[in-house]
A protein has these predicted regions:
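Acidic/histidine-rich catalytic cores of soluble enzymes
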Residues: 1-60
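Active-site acidic/histidine proton-transfer and metal-coordination neighborhood
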Residues: 6, 64, 107
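A general structural detector for well-ordered alpha-helical segments in enzyme core domains, enriched
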Residues: 14, 18, 65-66, 95-100
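Short, well-ordered coil/turn segments that N-cap beta-strands
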Residues: 21-23, 73-77
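A short, acidic, amphipathic alpha-helical segment used as a generic capping/interface helix at domain edges
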Residues: 58-72
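A short, acidic, flexible beta-alpha connecting loop/helix-capping segment that sits on the rim
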Residues: 80-89
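C-terminal helical cap(s) of enzyme catalytic domains, especially alpha/beta-barrels
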Residues: 89-108
């Protein structure tokens, strides 16, 4: 869900276009820093935004909205987590799982 931000696209809009074709999704979140050239870390998008990875549900990506779009399109598959944050990866994933559960995603 968050990868669309890497090319300055609206994640919810992109998910709405692709949802009917989805057979697997992964959730990823970013803290977006608008047009900060001197930002010391993260990724620089083609539009000069800086993206810093964070736990799913802790950033600026519309994760809940994307999940709702997927559900309304009939997606009932797995949601994997992709964590690229600066903190411990186990803790980052644990927090992402908690947040996804609070958004209505079930675990097995």
């Amino acid at each position: 869900m968050g990868n669309f931000a890497c090319v300055d696209e609206d994640s919810a809009h992109a998910v709405s276009i692709l949802a009917p074709y989805a057979f697997h999704v992964h959730a990823k979140d970013w803290l977006v820093h608008e047009f900060e050239e001197d930002f010391p870390s993260g990724y620089k998008t083609r539009g000069c935004r800086r993206l810093v990875g964070c736990s799913v549900g802790e950033g600026n990506m519309p994760i809940k909205r994307c999940l709702a779009i997927l559900k309304s399109a009939g997606y009932d598959g797995y949601v994997s987590i992709e964590y690229e944050g600066p903190n411990d990866c186990i803790e980052g994933i644990r927090l992402g799982i908690e947040n996804l559960k609070s958004f209505g995603v079930t675990t097995e």
